[in-house]
Amino acid sequence: MTTTPVIAASLTIPPLENGDKLTRWEFERRYQEMPHLKKAELIEGIVYMASPLRFESHAEPHANIIGWLALYKAATPGVRLGDNATVRLDIDNEPQPDALLRIDKGGQSTISQDDYVEGAPELIVEIAASSASYDVHQKLNVYRRNQVQEYLVWRFYEQEIDWFRLQAGEYIKLEPDSDGIMRSQIFPGLWLDKNALLMGDLGKVLVILQRGLETAEHRDFVNKLTANHS
């Protein structure tokens, strides 16, 4: 009597592993079969899977960034905020950035029928351990090439924040003014007190942001977005 081996359905699709070289379609197919997996990214055709997240070096800074961006979103109709949303950038790149801001109507990105971001959001934020992280190298090049207009990287262990603005195909660092305030050039009124954020003073971060939200530039931006929605 012969028997036919039965292969469990869960084993017919190989699991994702760090370093796998995959197409975006195969990456998505495997990722969807691993619902327990919270974060995996495809960068230049290579799979990167996140390690367990530490509190002080990632989870808390991440939450502070989301709080900062959430206040901006609340005051800016027509702007949408994503937290760890998968982004289909191109055939070799599907990152899952810590945070993103996108212009809903008339912006660079869209929401697909299956509810993914497609195209480059206007702003992406990543929390990185240090300058050795792939957030500062491979991802930076991918975001630049796909025309993410602004890219903010918080290098936690080096206590530094780099805010890049795309100009003529290259990323140029935005520098703080004499008061230590950094200002987005894509999202008027999105002001950041760099030192307050690095010190974990979310209250001061939000106070400075509120000042940006009270400017004429922000009011004009809101009027423009409102007109796009009408």
Q: What is the predicted function of each stretch?
A:
Residues M1-S230:
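Gly/Pro/Ser/Thr-rich low-complexity, intrinsically disordered segments predominantly at protein N-termini
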